[in-house]
Amino acid sequence: MVKVYAPASIGNVSVGFDVLGAAVSPIDGTLLGDCVSVEAAETFSLQNAGRFVSKLPDDPKENIVYQCWERFCQEIGQQIPVAMRLEKNMPIGSGLGSSACSVVAGLMAMNEFCNRPLDKMTLLGLMGELEGRISGSVHYDNVAPCYLGGLQLMLEEEGFISQEVPCFKDWLWVMAYPGIKVSTAEARAILPAQYRRQDCISHGRYLAGFIHACHTQQPRLAAKLMQDVIAEPYRTRLLPGFADARKAAQDIGALACGISGSGPTLFAVCDDGATAQRMADWLTNHYLQNDEGFVHICRLDTAGARLLG
């Protein structure tokens, strides 16, 4: 049997709309992500389990893990009879790369089970294609970090889909999911079709400056440049309490605060444990809306998707 864990990810990381993504894992060892197991069988089957299993579609063929199996078999030109099991530990529509977790874990598990017939870039291309079926368009800012780990910059040139950007080992990423759902498609539809020239210039400056600060290891400068002029001004209205949380992050001493992907999860970057804990406590008391919500203090997950057991 093969079992793969795929971690949560932050799409956009504020400053890089559709071109930056970061994988994260809780510092307490909690597996914040999905697991998919594959074992030999006479015919294909798919079993679902996990905390958020009730959110999955009733029709097995609408399950993205089934579609991963189907697309993988098509790619290698062979039907592989297997029993698959999805542990859905990630809330759907959370802004934590939930669909990416299932896609990455599903495709990597099949590839490992079949002794890796597909190379990493081919597999990553399939991951983007499958995730795009859910989000409505192909973009790699969740699947790339989820699969490869770390902070990934999307390139899509010279045979590379993405490459890793050096980040800051001391940073703690406080992740808060309030327990409500925001559709990625809805969150994309709310964005304007065109942007002002000044916004385009600011976006380019922030993104270029952030990448430069990462490569030259200037954490304060990098955090200062984590500003979103593309999505956050429009998506804030979809996120009850986000404006208050952003103000609290500033008061508490977080280096940066932003929307994770399409939301409603937010992240706050801190450079010491005490500040991160104060931020986590505030978010637990003020940002969570029901018992499905949660807060985790995380670090960058540099390993990405990996075999378990």
UniProtKB/Swiss-Prot annotation:
One Gene Ontology CC term in the entry: cytoplasm
Listed SUPFAM superfamilies: GHMP Kinase, C-terminal domain, Ribosomal protein S5 domain 2-like
Record-level GO BP terms: threonine biosynthetic process
Superkingdom field: Bacteria
Chief localisation class: cytoplasm
Recorded metabolic or biological pathway in which this protein acts: Amino-acid biosynthesis; L-threonine biosynthesis; L-threonine from L-aspartate: step 4/5
GO MF assignments: ATP binding; homoserine kinase activity
Organism: Serratia proteamaculans (strain 568)
Localisation per UniProt entry: Cytoplasm
Name of the featured protein: Homoserine kinase
PROSITE patterns in alphabetical order: GHMP_KINASES_ATP
Catalytic activity: L-homoserine + ATP = O-phospho-L-homoserine + ADP + H(+)
Binding residue positions for ATP: P91, I92, G93, S94, G95, L96, G97, S98, S99, A100, C101
Enzyme Commission code(s) on record: 2.7.1.39
Protein family according to the UniProt entry: Belongs to the GHMP kinase family. Homoserine kinase subfamily.
UniProt keywords, alphabetically: Amino-acid biosynthesis, ATP-binding, Cytoplasm, Kinase, Nucleotide-binding, Threonine biosynthesis, Transferase
Known function: Catalyzes the ATP-dependent phosphorylation of L-homoserine to L-homoserine phosphate.
ATP-binding listed as a keyword: yes
InterPro entries, sorted: GHMP_kinase_C_dom, GHMP_kinase_C_sf, GHMP_kinase_N_dom, GHMP_knse_ATP-bd_CS, Homoserine_kinase, Ribosomal_Su5_D2-typ_SF, Ribsml_uS5_D2-typ_fold_subgr
